[in-house]
Amino acid sequence: MNWLDEINWNADGLVPAIAQDHKTGRVLMMAWMNREALQLTAQENRAIYWSRSRGKLWRKGEESGHVQQLHELRLDCDADVIILMVEQIGGIACHTGRESCFYRVFENGAWKVVEPVLKDPHAIYAEHKHE
């Protein structure tokens, strides 16, 4: 059996993929992968996701420079969630310019921002458009 056949893909042919810092275990982001994205991730040793909004492969860092170098892939007990242990190049995983996409905490009935913006996202994406 092909290793990709062991995954319980959802009805859309996708599986949730959680990126974690390979040293600290901190959750950086969650995205989706289709079969091709997961296969390419394993081949290229970098995170490649499926963009549902754009309907195409999304090589993390292709626009921002914030590539996720793959250290390890893990599959959960139900074979329906992938974890990518990664090195986050540039220290920014979120398109908002933060280290993690999980920068809000629920406090007193509201979501509170608890993580700083490390770099203005307009500056991040403008830099890489001119390269």
UniProtKB/Swiss-Prot annotation:
Positions bound to Zn(2+): C77, C94, C101
Cofactor info, note text: Binds 1 Mg(2+) ion per subunit. Binds 1 zinc ion per subunit.
Pfam families: PRA-CH (PF01502)
Catalytic activity from the UniProt record: 1-(5-phospho-beta-D-ribosyl)-5'-AMP + H2O = 1-(5-phospho-beta-D-ribosyl)-5-[(5-phospho-beta-D-ribosylamino)methylideneamino]imidazole-4-carboxamide
Top-rank taxon, per record: Bacteria
Predominant location: cytoplasm
Pathway: Amino-acid biosynthesis; L-histidine biosynthesis; L-histidine from 5-phospho-alpha-D-ribose 1-diphosphate: step 3/9
Gene3D superfamilies in alphabetical order: Phosphoribosyl-AMP cyclohydrolase
Co-factor requirement: Mg(2+); Zn(2+)
Gene Ontology molecular function, alphabetical: magnesium ion binding; phosphoribosyl-AMP cyclohydrolase activity; zinc ion binding
Subunit structure: Homodimer.
Protein name: Phosphoribosyl-AMP cyclohydrolase
Protein's organism: Stutzerimonas stutzeri (strain A1501) (Pseudomonas stutzeri)
Organism taxonomic ancestry: Bacteria, Pseudomonadati, Pseudomonadota, Gammaproteobacteria, Pseudomonadales
